[in-house]
Amino acid sequence: MSLKLNRRTFLRGVGAALPLPYLHLMEASAKTTNGGKPPVRFMTLFKPNGVHPPSWNINGGTEFDFRMSPLMRPFAHHKQDLLILDNMGDFGFSSHANSTRRFLSGHHQNTKSPSVDQLIADKIGQDTPHRSLELTTEGLFTNQIGCSYISYDKNGDPVPRESDPQLIFDRLFRNPLSHPAKRREMASLLDAVNDDAKSLARKAGREDQEILDEYLTVVRQTEQRLENLKNAPNAGIDFSKLKRPGRAANLNEQVETMLDLVALALWTDSTRCATYMLGNSNSRIIFDFLGIKEQHHYLSHFFRNNSRHNLDQLLKITLWHMEKFDYLLNRMKSYKDQHGTLLDHSLVMFGSGMGHSDNHTATRIPMILAGQGGGMIKTGRYLRYAENQQVGRLHLALMQKFGVDISSYADSDKPLPGLDGSPFKPYRERPFESWVKKAGGTITAQGRLRLSEDLNEAKIFYIDVAGKPSVRIEVAFRDFHDFNLAYHCGTAIKLTGSGVDRGGQLVITKVTELKSLFGRKPGTQNG
């Protein structure tokens, strides 16, 4: 008689229940229960506080022929598994709390309905031990509580998050009926299920034995890393004498452990839906393990707190975020699934709630989809849409692909096109005439506005004029904010202001009027 297992098979020991990854022994059961198709998982990874646009944005290139930006270099080797979306977001600029809500709720005013992850979890999370996981890196930011949540329930209320890897591990891989004192006495969860594992290994074929061995090794490594975190060298320290009491001893290892647990939970089908915040929007984390002494939020305002040193520190933090995205993709690629890798049959949504980290623009929001989603999307592409696209259109498209019966979401009633290779309207710059005029101390320039790519002049904008030196825009924060210069970047404008001629280059130092050539309006602040 042959041994048959289903996807809900566990290795069991006293006080422990360990879910299994896919084995060939399960194939007959899988064909019976889901038509032979592997389950598709949905994972979101949130990056706080936006980006430095010149370091993030892709300028030029086509759908299939494009060069990834400097901030994308940590995960550039995954290019063929990525769908990079550009011109995502609504008009104007936003508060930290509203931009955070937008990330998974389509619009900041969508406050009475579930977030997209919860709607997808309702569809795909009913057959797993855990309907969904909501994870974070930081505690609550009480000044603006909305900065701390991206997941919302059916009433529009925040879904509680978990930030402790040990509690997540217990929730996923320990029997909840086991007494906590007994749990702590276990040297290793694997010891508790060792006999069951050996018995299964004797009955399994060679390929399954290799997969099972790899799986148990991963669990053992993860548990050991959790133990290392718990035994961090701070036992005898008088915390009242520390400058920053309560600061995590090893943030990098904590985050990577959480990513290990997410990948493991998805791989074992413990859950099919997970969200993880790498920090609150308005994050006050100090990345001292990177040699940084200022809070992330302070550094994100690189215009008003401008210095080359501060910008370098911000970019170092942002690159760390990108490295964690890369870490997750590497983990998911390393795990075998029924018909490929875990990533092949997952859809990972990575991004932020705002674009320009200082001005909080709600345009050109960083947004990337990774994985094939079991054929839901076509990757290896860069889609820059002709006009700003509400994030709700993306959410609507994703929900429909996951089988959610929904025709509109937030303020969007049309799904975002192009994700699966279907036609979409790409960005094409309209023709315009560029020129510059100077009359006394007044300068008027018409052309494409851009933010300087020189990291030594992060506050400087330029208007490109055909056949002439670019006009330099060198203004105080008030003009930067009131005229929403960050919003108009990359578009054609006519700008008038007072300025001077510096050795043949015209420099505008005070803006008096700004007009979009094609009717782009920043709108009002979204809170």
Predicted regions and their residues:
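Ligand-binding pockets and gating/stacking loops
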Residues: 1-430
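N-terminal post-signal-peptidase region of extra-cytosolic proteins
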Residues: 66, 476-483
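Short boundary/loop segments of OB/S1/cold-shock single-stranded nucleic-acid-binding domains
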Residues: 428-441
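Structural detector for short beta-strands of small beta-barrel domains
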Residues: 440-457
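OB-fold and OB-like beta-barrel modules that bind single-stranded nucleic acids
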Residues: 444-449, 490-499
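OB-fold (S1/OB) nucleic-acid-binding surfaces
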Residues: 457-475
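Short nucleic-acid-contacting surface segments enriched for D/E, G, S/T with interspersed K/R
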Residues: 480-494
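OB-fold/S1-family single-stranded nucleic acid-binding modules
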Residues: 502-523
